[in-house]
Structure formats: C-alpha cells, structure tokens
Amino acid sequence: MRSRIRNTMMILCFALILSFVSCSNTRVDEKKQIYIGVTCYDQKDTFIGELIETFKKECASLDTDKYDISMTIMDAAGSQRAQDDQVQEMIEDGCNVLCINLADRTDLSHIINAAMEKDIPIIFFNREPVDEDLNRWDKLYYVGARAKQSGQMQGELIADYIKNNPGVDKNGDGRIQYVILEGEMGHQDAIVRTESVTESMKNNGLQIEKLSCQIANWNRAQAQNRMTQLIGQYKNCIELVIANNDAMALGAMDAYEKLGVTESNVPAFFGVDGTDDGLEAVQQSKLAATVYNDKEGQARAMAQLAYLAATGGSMKNIKFEDKKYVYLPYEKVTPDNVNEFVKDEQ
C-alpha cells in the first residue's frame, strides 16, 4: 500500500515538473506585442493611401523574433474631432505608439495631452505640426518632406520643359498664362508649394501671368470641376496647369478630355507626389513631369521610429534634424527617368 502511494506521489511530482518546464518554455518563446495606432486625415487621398500601404509592408518586414506587431488604421475623413476620438479609442485599447496624419495641424492639443498622460509616443507624418506643439514633449516626432523643395523642383521642371518646348506659349506673347490648383485652404504644404513654384519659375527666367488659383482639396474630382469652370472662363488662353499634387493634375486632364478639347489647345500639366497614376501619366506623356514624394523612405522611417519608440530602443542611427524631424528629399520625375520610379513601385 505504501509503495503504491509512494509511486503515485512520484508520478504526480514528475507531472508537476513537466508542467512547470512546459510553462517556462512557453513564457520564453512567447513574443511581446507591439500595437501601433494609425489615424489619417483622409484615406481617400491617393498619396496617403499609398503611403499607408507601404508603411504596413515596412512594419511586416521588421525583425519580429521578439515582437508581434499589430496595427489599427482609422480614417478621420477630414474631421479633427473624429480624429481626437480615434486617438482616445486607440489609447484606451492599449496602443504602444501612435502614427498620426493630422486632420488639422493647428488643433492637436487634445491629442498631445492624451498621449502624454499615458506616456505614448507620437509620430506625426505628412502633415507637419507647428514647432511649438512638437517641442512640448521629447516623445513627439515628425516624418515627411520639405514642401518648399517640391515647389522649387516643380518650377525647375516647368522652366526646363518650356525652354525645350517653346510651343507651350500658344499665343506667342512671351509670357506663360497659367492656373494653379491648390491643395487646401490654409494648409501649410499647399501654401508653400504654390509660393515656391511661382518663385522658382521666375528665378529660372520664365515670364508668367497667373490667370487663377483654385482650391481643389487634393482631390481629383474637385480638380476636374474647378478646371471645367476655368476652361469655360478662359477658353484656350490657359497654357499651363500647375497642381499641388498629381491627383489634381489628373483631374484637370480629365476636364479637358471630357470636354473634348483639341490637343493643340490642351495646356501642359505638372504635379507633385509621384503616385502610381501620376507616374503612369508621365510614362504616357500626358503629365509633363511630377516631383516624387518618397513614400518608401517615409514609410521606412515611420516603421523604424515606431518600433524603437515602442520597445525603448536606441534612436542613434535615425537621421534626425533637431532631434525630432526626419525629412526625406523629393526627386524630379520626367519621361526620361520615370521608369526608375515605376520599377521601384513594382
């Protein structure tokens, strides 16, 4: 009887040891979780949509031996109030880091306060906060590009194109009559792009005359509507269409195509961003040129920052400016080099 009890106890002890070892191995092998909360001003924005898809791929390619990365992506649809609520929801759900494409760059006190209270780092992207806000806390960062550079490059592309294609000056008056499709009322990038492209054209020796500047909110359909109105007003006097982004440049082209304007009366079109559709239009010589906004570089920087911020890793290899800003340079895209960028897309 005693022998039977002793054997039973030995079996139970052995089972407990096995259970303990098994649990210990599970704990060793168990990965830690990183939860990234993302909110965009408008996912219908073509460039933002492409940037987010690239960001998802970059996060998936990170070294995840120790961590599983999950992500929630929300669309503010242009509403800062909605975005504030989304940020609060993701914080309550336990996110480790926030990536925010602001709906309103001048109204982010609620977001920063909520993140600071829970010690959650924020990476703002594409729509740059004002310096005063970003300097409120050492866990606030920005990833994007310099809007002025895009305007300067766009102006240089326009000047080079017109010098090589003097027929753009259809009425032969020595001046280029142009219209601008601007991104958004009061938006920093839109204002800076418009100002810098105008300055760049003048600095590169062009004589120019602005016929109109219309707000189209970065949107292809709105740009088509605005351009249709401008064609009705100015008829064949428009020699150049400058758009703050590719989507609006393509919308302007849509207007001419829908109205059936003869090719000899169609102006030259220039955009910014190098979206998939924009690059295709350059390949087809419908869009004279664009300026490439490096979404791959921005997505990579965002993913690295998010990973390091969430895990407490060293950021010494991040190429910051003023310890907070990561800027990726723009690049000029013409029919001569567009395939280099399209290849990168594939």
Name each region found by the language model.
Residues 10, 32, 43, 174-185, ...:
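Hinge/cleft segment of the Venus flytrap/periplasmic-binding protein
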Residues 55, 88, 100-117, 196-197, ...:
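Hydrophobic alpha-helical
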Residues 35-62, 72-85, 93-95, 101-105, ...:
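Extracytoplasmic "Venus flytrap"
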Residues 1-35, 91-92, 113-120, 339-342, ...:
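Short, low-complexity disordered leader/linker segments with a strong preference
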Residues 61-76, 177-180, 202-216:
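Short beta-strand elements in bilobed, periplasmic/extracellular small-molecule ligand-binding domains
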Residues 83, 142-174, 223-224, 274-278, ...:
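Hydrophobic alpha-helical segments within soluble ligand-binding/sensing domains
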Residues 111-149, 168-174, 275-283, 287-288:
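Flexible loop/hinge segments that line or gate small-molecule binding clefts
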Residues 47-63, 150-154, 188-207, 222, ...:
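Short, solvent-exposed amphipathic alpha-helices that sit
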